[in-house]
Amino acid sequence: MLVNARKLLIIPLFFIGWHTVQAQEVWTLKQCIDSAILHNKTLKVNQNNINISTYKEKEAKANLLPKIAANVDYNYFIELPTQLMPMNVFNPQVPEGQFRNIQFGVPHNINANVRLTMPLYNPQVYGAIENAIIANELSQLQFQKSEEQVLYDITTLYYNAQILKNQLYFLDSNWINTQKLLKNMQLLKEQLLAKGTDVSKIQLQADQLSTQKENVSNKYSSILNMLKLNIGIPMEQDVDVIAELEEQQLNHYTRENTVDFEIVKAYNKLLNNELTVLNRSKTLPTINLVASYGTTGFGYDKAPDNFLKFYPIGFVGLQLNYPIFNGTVTLQKINQKKLEISNNELQAQLIDDKNRVEIENSERQKTMAQQTIINTKNQINLAQSIYEQSILQQKQGVATLTDILLADNALREAQQNYLLAIMDYLKADLEIKKLKGIIKN
């Protein structure tokens, strides 16, 4: 809820025909926000995104672990492989350049081995790990941003519901006053002291108030449905808001970095890390440890010399891959990344400049709204007094029905302006908190 708040003076009102709203469970703003943190589906999606980023970070780190694979290969040669052998190997007197085709091997060949590969140094793997860590930070910042947005949306909906609820209270009070006036005018007509058109004018005003009440009531129900949707609770659940409005003093909040600015900074960190990885991959080699152990089998299935024999084989070694020239692909990627970093820095400056302008505008709007609240509150009291005096003067025969209707319209206009001023104030205050990065405080 709002802090450092003083309760606004709300004129005592009476309620008629609004039993449905009264029967609903009343939720405070804090209850709505606390429930949304638990049930809001947008927050659940972003929480899952954080978990996904955590697993991606673990996936990147897993590339440093050794990879072990088992391989089995069996070949049956219908035709044995043929090799060309120099004939002077068998007969030195044969001149060079003469060959003889000879088939080597046996039909059955079996190879089975276990192979291990482990990166000893790979700049791309280490860069991917650093990127995954930064991406995880970005996911958490995105969650904070969505959390703040949900808080902002729920608070705005709650304020709108409060304004509509108070508007209904005003309409109820005005409708009661109109009904009283209508009864008095009907009595005067029966006594031939008023015209039929006077009664019709008041009846028209009563009908208009009933229509306004119905429209505002429908808007109120729609706002409550949107509030339930943002909280994440079923539409069937009854929810109502506190009718009493609250107004803050003109506090000056301390400005902190907004989540949007922190996201831009984290993205800048990611871009610079990607640039570092590209520079490393251009000049540094990759080194892998490789090892293999297995067996090779040879078989012959013709009698009487059929056999199947296996011979062990194993090795340990290093693989080194050094980039010499890749067609300037890496260079072009580096140039692109530098421009992305430049755009990111410009975006950070733009966010900061825009934030300052919006804070100044919102603070000005808040100051104006607070003064308007004071003025319209006085106008309501004055309009109420004029209306009551007009009723009294009409009974004394001094004021006309037109005077009463004008006073009634002035009262309703003052009430509407009062509620609009409160809404402007609350929205401006909430916007300032959002712009200064303290909306969750």
Predicted feature residues:
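Acidic, low-complexity, intrinsically disordered peripheral segments
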Residues: 69, 78-80, 87, 417-441
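Bacterial Sec-dependent N-terminal signal peptides
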Residues: 1-40, 419, 425, 440-441
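Extended, amphipathic, non-transmembrane alpha-helical segments
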Residues: 167-188, 215-226, 360, 372-394, ...
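Sec/SRP-type N-terminal targeting helices
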Residues: 44-48, 61-62, 120-147, 197, ...
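Amphipathic alpha-helical coiled-coil/helical-bundle segments that mediate oligomerization/assembly
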Residues: 161, 199, 216, 366, ...
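Short terminal targeting/anchoring segments
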Residues: 197, 396-420
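Periplasmic alpha-helical coiled-coil/stalk elements that build and connect Gram-negative outer-membrane
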Residues: 55, 143, 147-257
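A small-residue-enriched
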Residues: 34-120, 257-327, 332
